[in-house]
């Protein structure tokens, strides 16, 4: 008999499961462009979709790595045999994914690239991908012993209101360098997309759409219109006289 739990406890349990799963996959797949996870629960099994920029690395040779990850997830979270399935899905637009760009900046800094140059490169790539705006903040011991923060901004960025929840994608990462730990924060404002592929379907509250006027058909010959009053009944056909 299945154990009955309250709705409140169910939501908390689902949230903890997703947070732990996300933390585990972030640690395991950081070098493969891991960008998030989706969990779909069906009556027969649980489907876990891993979003990444390099899906081939996630799958591994002949699907070996994805099978290993499936076994680890199954054992860690106590799923019955064959009831959990892992899939790898490629991120549609890498430039509009804050997690992917934060990881990209992290590896640039680990490679020894100058902070300003690395941040401007990420900023330019995000804006070229069609973002409405972006903000990159790097803080820590950038130069010298005193910690400071550098902010790089381009385009439009909203900071308050409900649209922030679905228009702004945020990611935070940390990178350990010789001089200490640097913090990386990337915020991307997504564009409005009526199809919902690269951005939210819902437009911003202050969005004004101008409706194009219909083309007016100009009359080529004189015509007369009867406005108001009752239309005249059609004339009755006259009888044809017979000889």
UniProtKB/Swiss-Prot annotation:
Source organism (scientific name): Pongo abelii (Sumatran orangutan)
Modified residue annotations for N6-acetyllysine: 62
**TM helices/strands, residue ranges:** none
Membrane disposition: Peripheral membrane protein
Q: Which residues, renumbered to this chain, carry the PTM Phosphothreonine?
A: 42, 70, 220-221, 242
Is Ion transport one of the keywords? no
For this UniProt record, the keywords arranged alphabetically read as follows: Acetylation, Apoptosis, Cell cycle, Cell division, Cytoplasm, Cytoskeleton, DNA damage, DNA repair, DNA-binding, Isopeptide bond, Lyase, Membrane, Methylation, Mitochondrion, Mitochondrion inner membrane, Mitosis, Nucleus, Phosphoprotein, Ribonucleoprotein, Ribosomal protein, RNA-binding, Transcription, Transcription regulation, Translation regulation, Ubl conjugation
Which terms in the Gene Ontology molecular function aspect does this entry carry? class I DNA-(apurinic or apyrimidinic site) endonuclease activity; DNA binding; RNA binding; structural constituent of ribosome
Subcellular location field: Cytoplasm; Nucleus; Nucleus, Nucleolus; Mitochondrion inner membrane
The name of this protein is: Small ribosomal subunit protein uS3
Residues with Asymmetric dimethylarginine modification: 64-65, 67
- Where Phosphoserine occurs, residue numbers? 6, 35, 104, 209, 224
